[in-house]
Protein backbone atom coordinates (compact mmCIF):
# COMPACT_ATOMS: atom_id res chain seq x y z
CA UNK A 1 0.00 0.00 0.00
CA UNK A 2 2.82 2.43 0.91
CA UNK A 3 4.53 1.66 -2.39
CA UNK A 4 1.34 2.44 -4.32
CA UNK A 5 0.97 5.79 -2.52
CA UNK A 6 4.58 6.75 -3.31
CA UNK A 7 4.13 5.85 -6.98
CA UNK A 8 0.98 8.00 -7.11
CA UNK A 9 2.82 11.00 -5.61
CA UNK A 10 5.66 10.65 -8.11
CA UNK A 11 3.09 10.65 -10.92
CA UNK A 12 1.52 13.87 -9.64
CA UNK A 13 4.93 15.59 -9.42
CA UNK A 14 5.85 14.53 -12.97
CA UNK A 15 2.48 15.83 -14.26
CA UNK A 16 3.01 19.23 -12.57
CA UNK A 17 6.52 19.56 -14.01
CA UNK A 18 5.22 18.72 -17.47
CA UNK A 19 2.27 21.13 -17.37
CA UNK A 20 3.89 24.23 -15.78
CA UNK A 21 7.58 24.47 -16.75
CA UNK A 22 7.37 27.73 -18.76
CA UNK A 23 5.46 29.62 -16.09
CA UNK A 24 8.07 28.82 -13.45
CA UNK A 25 10.98 29.74 -15.70
CA UNK A 26 9.43 33.03 -16.83
CA UNK A 27 9.06 34.26 -13.24
CA UNK A 28 12.58 33.16 -12.38
CA UNK A 29 14.24 34.90 -15.32
CA UNK A 30 12.73 38.37 -15.13
CA UNK A 31 12.69 41.08 -12.52
CA UNK A 32 9.37 41.99 -11.01
CA UNK A 33 7.93 45.15 -12.58
CA UNK A 34 7.61 48.25 -10.43
CA UNK A 35 4.72 50.59 -9.71
CA UNK A 36 5.21 54.15 -8.50
CA UNK A 37 3.48 54.99 -5.24
CA UNK A 38 3.41 58.34 -3.50
CA UNK A 39 4.28 58.50 0.16
CA UNK A 40 4.60 61.40 2.57
CA UNK A 41 8.24 61.46 1.54
CA UNK A 42 8.10 63.65 -1.60
CA UNK A 43 10.53 61.42 -3.46
CA UNK A 44 8.66 58.95 -5.65
CA UNK A 45 9.47 55.42 -4.55
CA UNK A 46 9.13 52.14 -6.46
CA UNK A 47 7.20 49.26 -4.97
CA UNK A 48 8.06 45.87 -6.57
CA UNK A 49 5.06 43.79 -7.56
CA UNK A 50 4.83 40.26 -6.23
CA UNK A 51 5.74 37.84 -9.02
CA UNK A 52 2.75 35.61 -8.32
CA UNK A 53 0.16 38.28 -9.16
CA UNK A 54 -2.87 36.49 -10.50
CA UNK A 55 -4.72 39.50 -11.97
CA UNK A 56 -3.08 42.08 -14.27
CA UNK A 57 -4.07 45.06 -12.07
CA UNK A 58 -3.77 43.43 -8.67
CA UNK A 59 -0.39 45.01 -7.93
CA UNK A 60 -1.64 48.43 -9.00
CA UNK A 61 -4.74 48.02 -6.85
CA UNK A 62 -2.59 47.08 -3.88
CA UNK A 63 -0.35 50.12 -4.35
CA UNK A 64 -3.38 52.38 -4.66
CA UNK A 65 -4.77 51.08 -1.38
CA UNK A 66 -1.46 51.49 0.43
CA UNK A 67 -0.58 54.93 -0.95
CA UNK A 68 -1.69 57.97 1.08
CA UNK A 69 -3.78 60.75 -0.44
CA UNK A 70 -1.91 62.87 -3.03
CA UNK A 71 -0.04 65.88 -1.69
CA UNK A 72 -1.11 69.40 -2.63
CA UNK A 73 2.40 70.05 -3.92
CA UNK A 74 3.00 67.42 -6.60
CA UNK A 75 6.08 65.40 -5.61
CA UNK A 76 8.93 65.15 -8.10
CA UNK A 77 8.53 62.37 -10.64
CA UNK A 78 12.13 61.32 -10.18
CA UNK A 79 14.44 61.20 -7.20
CA UNK A 80 16.32 64.44 -6.63
CA UNK A 81 20.07 64.01 -7.09
CA UNK A 82 20.96 66.77 -4.59
CA UNK A 83 19.61 66.95 -1.04
CA UNK A 84 18.90 70.17 0.88
CA UNK A 85 21.34 71.35 3.53
CA UNK A 86 20.36 71.63 7.19
CA UNK A 87 22.00 75.05 7.62
CA UNK A 88 22.07 78.10 5.37
CA UNK A 89 25.15 77.99 3.11
CA UNK A 90 27.57 80.88 2.78
CA UNK A 91 28.53 79.84 -0.74
CA UNK A 92 27.09 77.58 -3.44
CA UNK A 93 29.29 76.69 -6.41
CA UNK A 94 29.31 74.34 -9.37
CA UNK A 95 32.07 71.74 -9.25
CA UNK A 96 33.07 72.60 -12.81
CA UNK A 97 31.82 73.93 -16.13
CA UNK A 98 28.59 72.18 -17.21
CA UNK A 99 28.96 69.50 -19.86
CA UNK A 100 27.01 70.32 -23.03
CA UNK A 101 25.47 67.75 -25.37
CA UNK A 102 24.34 68.62 -28.89
CA UNK A 103 20.92 67.01 -29.40
CA UNK A 104 20.12 68.35 -32.87
CA UNK A 105 21.13 71.13 -35.26
CA UNK A 106 18.47 71.48 -37.95
CA UNK A 107 19.50 74.40 -40.15
CA UNK A 108 16.48 74.10 -42.46
CA UNK A 109 13.96 74.15 -39.61
CA UNK A 110 15.97 76.72 -37.67
CA UNK A 111 15.92 74.58 -34.55
CA UNK A 112 19.03 73.86 -32.50
CA UNK A 113 18.83 71.87 -29.26
CA UNK A 114 21.48 71.49 -26.57
CA UNK A 115 21.46 69.88 -23.14
CA UNK A 116 23.27 70.20 -19.83
CA UNK A 117 22.66 67.85 -16.88
CA UNK A 118 19.34 69.44 -15.80
CA UNK A 119 18.27 71.66 -18.73
CA UNK A 120 17.38 71.43 -22.39
CA UNK A 121 17.86 74.59 -24.45
CA UNK A 122 16.03 75.00 -27.75
CA UNK A 123 17.42 77.85 -29.84
CA UNK A 124 16.43 79.50 -33.12
CA UNK A 125 20.09 79.97 -34.09
CA UNK A 126 23.19 77.75 -33.88
CA UNK A 127 24.91 78.76 -30.65
CA UNK A 128 27.37 75.89 -30.35
CA UNK A 129 28.44 74.05 -27.19
CA UNK A 130 31.05 76.62 -26.10
CA UNK A 131 28.50 79.44 -26.03
CA UNK A 132 25.91 77.25 -24.28
CA UNK A 133 28.54 76.27 -21.72
CA UNK A 134 29.09 79.98 -21.04
CA UNK A 135 25.51 80.79 -20.03
CA UNK A 136 24.58 77.33 -18.72
CA UNK A 137 26.50 78.11 -15.53
CA UNK A 138 23.70 80.46 -14.45
CA UNK A 139 21.05 77.81 -15.11
CA UNK A 140 22.84 74.90 -13.44
CA UNK A 141 24.07 76.98 -10.48
CA UNK A 142 20.55 78.32 -9.83
CA UNK A 143 19.25 74.76 -9.84
CA UNK A 144 21.98 73.82 -7.36
CA UNK A 145 21.18 76.82 -5.14
CA UNK A 146 17.48 75.98 -4.97
CA UNK A 147 18.27 72.34 -4.22
CA UNK A 148 20.68 73.12 -1.39
CA UNK A 149 18.86 75.86 0.52
CA UNK A 150 17.34 74.49 3.76
CA UNK A 151 13.90 75.44 2.40
CA UNK A 152 14.00 72.00 0.74
CA UNK A 153 12.11 73.12 -2.38
CA UNK A 154 12.98 69.91 -4.25
CA UNK A 155 13.21 71.47 -7.73
CA UNK A 156 11.98 69.05 -10.39
CA UNK A 157 11.14 69.34 -14.09
CA UNK A 158 7.53 69.85 -15.01
CA UNK A 159 5.30 66.74 -15.33
CA UNK A 160 6.21 64.38 -18.18
CA UNK A 161 9.60 66.05 -18.63
CA UNK A 162 13.01 64.82 -17.57
CA UNK A 163 14.77 68.18 -18.00
CA UNK A 164 13.86 71.81 -17.39
CA UNK A 165 13.05 73.56 -20.66
CA UNK A 166 14.53 76.86 -21.84
CA UNK A 167 13.84 78.67 -25.10
CA UNK A 168 16.67 80.94 -26.28
CA UNK A 169 15.69 83.59 -28.85
CA UNK A 170 18.44 85.05 -31.03
CA UNK A 171 16.99 88.58 -31.22
CA UNK A 172 14.73 90.85 -29.24
CA UNK A 173 12.01 90.83 -31.93
CA UNK A 174 11.65 87.05 -31.69
CA UNK A 175 11.64 87.36 -27.90
CA UNK A 176 8.83 89.92 -28.01
CA UNK A 177 6.86 87.72 -30.42
CA UNK A 178 7.08 84.89 -27.86
CA UNK A 179 5.03 87.01 -25.46
CA UNK A 180 7.72 88.77 -23.47
CA UNK A 181 6.55 91.61 -21.22
CA UNK A 182 7.89 95.01 -22.36
CA UNK A 183 11.39 95.65 -21.04
CA UNK A 184 11.79 92.10 -19.75
CA UNK A 185 15.13 90.30 -19.82
CA UNK A 186 13.46 86.90 -19.57
CA UNK A 187 10.25 85.32 -18.32
CA UNK A 188 8.92 81.98 -17.13
CA UNK A 189 5.69 80.81 -18.75
CA UNK A 190 3.56 78.69 -16.43
CA UNK A 191 1.42 77.73 -19.43
CA UNK A 192 4.33 76.44 -21.53
CA UNK A 193 6.31 75.32 -18.47
CA UNK A 194 9.34 76.92 -20.09
CA UNK A 195 11.64 79.86 -19.52
CA UNK A 196 12.08 82.29 -22.43
CA UNK A 197 15.29 84.29 -22.67
CA UNK A 198 16.71 86.59 -25.36
CA UNK A 199 20.32 85.87 -26.29
CA UNK A 200 21.16 89.45 -25.31
CA UNK A 201 20.40 88.61 -21.66
CA UNK A 202 22.86 85.71 -21.76
CA UNK A 203 25.91 87.68 -22.81
CA UNK A 204 25.50 86.43 -26.38
CA UNK A 205 25.01 88.41 -29.59
CA UNK A 206 24.81 87.56 -33.28
CA UNK A 207 27.02 89.63 -35.55
CA UNK A 208 26.81 88.95 -39.29
CA UNK A 209 25.43 85.47 -38.66
CA UNK A 210 28.19 84.68 -36.18
CA UNK A 211 27.61 84.09 -32.47
CA UNK A 212 29.81 86.15 -30.18
CA UNK A 213 30.09 86.58 -26.42
CA UNK A 214 29.10 90.05 -25.26
CA UNK A 215 31.40 90.95 -22.38
CA UNK A 216 29.32 94.04 -21.57
CA UNK A 217 26.63 91.87 -19.97
CA UNK A 218 27.74 91.56 -16.35
CA UNK A 219 24.51 90.92 -14.44
CA UNK A 220 22.46 87.71 -14.40
CA UNK A 221 19.97 88.86 -11.76
CA UNK A 222 16.88 88.88 -14.01
CA UNK A 223 17.80 85.51 -15.50
CA UNK A 224 18.37 83.97 -12.05
CA UNK A 225 15.07 85.45 -10.86
CA UNK A 226 13.18 83.73 -13.70
CA UNK A 227 15.08 80.44 -13.37
CA UNK A 228 14.10 80.40 -9.69
CA UNK A 229 10.44 80.68 -10.72
CA UNK A 230 11.01 77.63 -12.91
CA UNK A 231 12.64 75.78 -10.01
CA UNK A 232 9.51 76.52 -7.94
CA UNK A 233 7.01 75.57 -10.67
CA UNK A 234 5.29 72.98 -8.45
CA UNK A 235 4.83 75.61 -5.74
CA UNK A 236 3.67 78.61 -7.78
CA UNK A 237 -0.09 77.88 -7.67
CA UNK A 238 0.02 77.18 -3.93
CA UNK A 239 2.13 79.94 -2.38
CA UNK A 240 1.31 83.63 -1.91
CA UNK A 241 2.67 85.91 -4.61
CA UNK A 242 4.85 87.87 -2.17
CA UNK A 243 6.72 84.64 -1.35
CA UNK A 244 7.22 83.34 -4.90
CA UNK A 245 8.43 86.78 -6.00
CA UNK A 246 10.43 87.34 -2.81
CA UNK A 247 12.25 84.01 -3.21
CA UNK A 248 13.11 84.84 -6.83
CA UNK A 249 14.26 88.35 -5.85
CA UNK A 250 16.47 86.89 -3.11
CA UNK A 251 18.22 84.53 -5.54
CA UNK A 252 18.60 87.32 -8.10
CA UNK A 253 20.09 89.66 -5.49
CA UNK A 254 22.84 87.22 -4.48
CA UNK A 255 26.37 87.87 -5.74
CA UNK A 256 26.92 85.45 -8.64
CA UNK A 257 30.28 85.04 -10.39
CA UNK A 258 31.26 82.26 -12.82
CA UNK A 259 28.91 79.58 -11.48
CA UNK A 260 29.31 80.54 -7.82
CA UNK A 261 26.76 82.17 -5.46
CA UNK A 262 28.16 84.11 -2.52
CA UNK A 263 25.54 84.27 0.26
CA UNK A 264 27.75 85.38 3.14
CA UNK A 265 27.31 89.08 2.29
CA UNK A 266 23.58 89.10 1.63
CA UNK A 267 23.01 92.07 3.95
CA UNK A 268 25.23 94.21 1.73
CA UNK A 269 23.58 92.83 -1.40
CA UNK A 270 20.15 93.64 0.07
CA UNK A 271 21.15 97.27 0.68
CA UNK A 272 22.53 97.50 -2.85
CA UNK A 273 19.27 96.12 -4.22
CA UNK A 274 17.22 98.59 -2.17
CA UNK A 275 19.37 101.50 -3.34
CA UNK A 276 18.65 100.40 -6.89
CA UNK A 277 14.95 100.65 -6.09
CA UNK A 278 15.16 104.12 -4.61
CA UNK A 279 16.35 103.70 -1.01
CA UNK A 280 18.06 106.74 0.51
CA UNK A 281 21.55 106.40 1.94
CA UNK A 282 21.57 107.57 5.58
CA UNK A 283 25.19 107.37 6.69
CA UNK A 284 25.98 103.66 6.81
CA UNK A 285 22.27 102.76 6.70
CA UNK A 286 19.64 102.87 3.97
CA UNK A 287 16.06 104.07 4.39
CA UNK A 288 13.27 102.51 2.35
CA UNK A 289 9.47 102.86 2.21
CA UNK A 290 8.03 99.33 2.45
CA UNK A 291 4.40 98.33 1.99
CA UNK A 292 2.76 97.55 5.32
CA UNK A 293 2.99 93.85 6.18
CA UNK A 294 -0.78 93.40 6.50
CA UNK A 295 -1.32 94.67 2.94
CA UNK A 296 1.65 92.75 1.55
CA UNK A 297 0.40 89.46 3.01
CA UNK A 298 -3.01 90.07 1.43
CA UNK A 299 -1.71 90.77 -2.10
CA UNK A 300 -2.98 88.24 -4.64
CA UNK A 301 -1.79 87.47 -8.15
CA UNK A 302 -4.26 89.69 -10.05
CA UNK A 303 -3.54 92.68 -7.79
CA UNK A 304 0.21 92.15 -8.22
CA UNK A 305 -0.16 91.89 -12.01
CA UNK A 306 -2.36 95.00 -12.17
CA UNK A 307 0.40 97.01 -10.51
CA UNK A 308 3.14 95.95 -12.91
CA UNK A 309 2.78 99.07 -15.07
CA UNK A 310 2.56 101.45 -12.09
CA UNK A 311 4.87 102.72 -9.36
CA UNK A 312 3.46 99.98 -7.13
CA UNK A 313 5.56 97.37 -8.95
CA UNK A 314 8.83 98.71 -7.56
CA UNK A 315 7.44 98.80 -4.03
CA UNK A 316 5.91 95.33 -4.37
CA UNK A 317 9.15 93.64 -5.47
CA UNK A 318 11.26 95.37 -2.83
CA UNK A 319 8.70 94.68 -0.09
CA UNK A 320 8.49 91.00 -1.06
CA UNK A 321 12.30 90.77 -0.95
CA UNK A 322 12.43 92.44 2.47
CA UNK A 323 9.80 90.16 4.00
CA UNK A 324 11.40 87.04 2.50
CA UNK A 325 14.89 88.12 3.64
CA UNK A 326 13.52 88.72 7.15
CA UNK A 327 11.95 85.25 7.31
CA UNK A 328 15.14 83.63 6.00
CA UNK A 329 17.65 85.43 8.22
CA UNK A 330 16.21 87.66 10.97
CA UNK A 331 12.90 86.39 12.34
CA UNK A 332 12.97 84.94 15.88
CA UNK A 333 15.98 82.57 16.11
CA UNK A 334 17.21 83.72 12.67
CA UNK A 335 17.15 80.14 11.37
CA UNK A 336 14.28 80.33 8.84
CA UNK A 337 12.33 77.89 11.02
CA UNK A 338 9.01 79.67 10.46
CA UNK A 339 9.44 79.76 6.70
CA UNK A 340 10.50 76.11 6.54
CA UNK A 341 7.54 75.04 8.69
CA UNK A 342 5.20 77.07 6.47
CA UNK A 343 6.51 75.33 3.34
CA UNK A 344 6.20 71.88 4.87
CA UNK A 345 2.60 72.63 5.90
CA UNK A 346 1.70 73.81 2.39
CA UNK A 347 3.43 70.73 0.99
CA UNK A 348 1.11 68.58 3.10
CA UNK A 349 -2.00 70.38 1.84
CA UNK A 350 -2.60 73.27 4.25
CA UNK A 351 -3.85 76.41 2.42
CA UNK A 352 -1.13 79.04 2.37
CA UNK A 353 -3.30 81.59 4.20
CA UNK A 354 -3.56 79.31 7.22
CA UNK A 355 0.10 78.30 6.97
CA UNK A 356 1.06 81.99 7.13
CA UNK A 357 -1.12 82.46 10.22
CA UNK A 358 0.28 79.38 11.94
CA UNK A 359 3.97 79.56 11.09
CA UNK A 360 4.83 83.05 9.80
CA UNK A 361 2.75 85.26 12.08
CA UNK A 362 2.74 82.48 14.69
CA UNK A 363 0.30 84.22 17.02
CA UNK A 364 1.50 87.76 16.23
CA UNK A 365 -0.76 90.41 14.77
CA UNK A 366 0.58 92.01 11.55
CA UNK A 367 1.31 95.29 13.38
CA UNK A 368 3.29 93.46 16.09
CA UNK A 369 5.12 91.42 13.45
CA UNK A 370 5.89 94.65 11.60
CA UNK A 371 7.32 96.25 14.74
CA UNK A 372 9.66 93.28 15.32
CA UNK A 373 10.66 93.34 11.67
CA UNK A 374 11.52 97.04 11.78
CA UNK A 375 13.71 96.59 14.85
CA UNK A 376 15.54 93.61 13.34
CA UNK A 377 16.29 95.46 10.09
CA UNK A 378 17.41 98.57 11.98
CA UNK A 379 20.00 96.34 13.63
CA UNK A 380 21.61 95.62 10.24
CA UNK A 381 21.40 99.16 8.89
CA UNK A 382 18.07 99.11 7.04
CA UNK A 383 15.51 101.69 8.22
CA UNK A 384 11.99 100.77 7.13
CA UNK A 385 9.13 103.22 6.81
CA UNK A 386 5.94 101.20 6.44
CA UNK A 387 3.43 102.76 4.06
CA UNK A 388 -0.27 102.21 3.39
CA UNK A 389 -1.83 101.98 -0.05
CA UNK A 390 -5.37 101.37 1.15
CA UNK A 391 -5.53 97.80 -0.11
CA UNK A 392 -7.00 94.72 1.53
CA UNK A 393 -5.42 93.74 4.85
CA UNK A 394 -4.55 90.15 5.79
CA UNK A 395 -6.80 88.66 8.46
CA UNK A 396 -4.69 87.04 11.22
Where do the PLM segments sit?
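Juxtacatalytic substrate-recognition/specificity segment
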Residues: 108-240, 351-353
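Charged, low-complexity, helix/coiled-coil-prone segments
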Residues: 48, 68-91, 164, 186-195, ...
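Short hydrophobic alpha-helical membrane-anchoring segments
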Residues: 10-19, 234, 254, 258, ...
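A long, hydrophobic alpha-helical segment
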Residues: 3-6, 228-234, 246-247, 254
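Short low-complexity stretches enriched in small and charged residues
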Residues: 68-81, 118-124, 203-207, 228, ...
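Acidic/His/Gly-enriched intrinsically disordered linker/tail segments
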Residues: 187-204, 218, 238-396
